[in-house]
Amino acid sequence: MAASMARGGVSARVLLQAARGTWWNRPGGTSGSGEGVALGTTRKFQATGSRPAGEEDAGGPERPGDVVNVVFVDRSGQRIPVSGRVGDNVLHLAQRHGVDLEGACEASLACSTCHVYVSEDHLDLLPPPEEREDDMLDMAPLLQENSRLGCQIVLTPELEGAEFTLPKITRNFYVDGHVPKPH
């Protein structure tokens, strides 16, 4: 219920009131029975048009323009064509299609195990890497000019036909050997 209310732009105050069963109406955050002065400011919860990267809706894309076809090239050189949606990130897309792209930090920008090489024709279509991504790429083995982290590449219509090649090796710095399950 809260999610559907949030999509409609329900104020935070109303959601808190519903959850607590009281109306917050007095300065200082004390509750009352509906008497007193209501808070003068409200904040609205609103859903954006995008969805979290990597999530897949059961209904599939709504418009043909939402589909982005890309190719993964695995460590053995096998080409794996997949279809994603605008807003997906490359790490989650690869995992969803069984491509062996690790993502040890679960897309939190704390490792370089989702390191990929981006096809030269599409590299300039990506925004430049932020400093945190560059820091993680510095730890990636076999770094090249077209290296990026898959968790930081978000599919756009311009990436139609892009190729993401997995390097021959990756380095997982997790001490305890934890390997997360793909989302």
Swiss-Prot record:
Residues 68-170 form the 2Fe-2S ferredoxin-type domain. Belongs to the adrenodoxin/putidaredoxin family. Gene3D superfamilies: 3.10.20.30. One of its GO terms (molecular function) is electron transfer activity. This is Ferredoxin-2, mitochondrial. It comes from the Eukaryota. Binds 1 [2Fe-2S] cluster. It is found in: Mitochondrion; Mitochondrion matrix. Component of the mitochondrial core iron-sulfur cluster (ISC) complex composed of NFS1, LYRM4, NDUFAB1, ISCU, FXN, and FDX2; this complex is a heterohexamer containing two copies of each monomer. Form a heterodimer complex with NFS1. Interacts (in both their reduced and oxidized states) with the cysteine desulfurase complex; this interaction stimulates cysteine desulfurase activity, and serves as a reductant for Fe-S cluster assembly. The lineage of its organism: Eukaryota, Metazoa, Chordata, Craniata, Vertebrata.
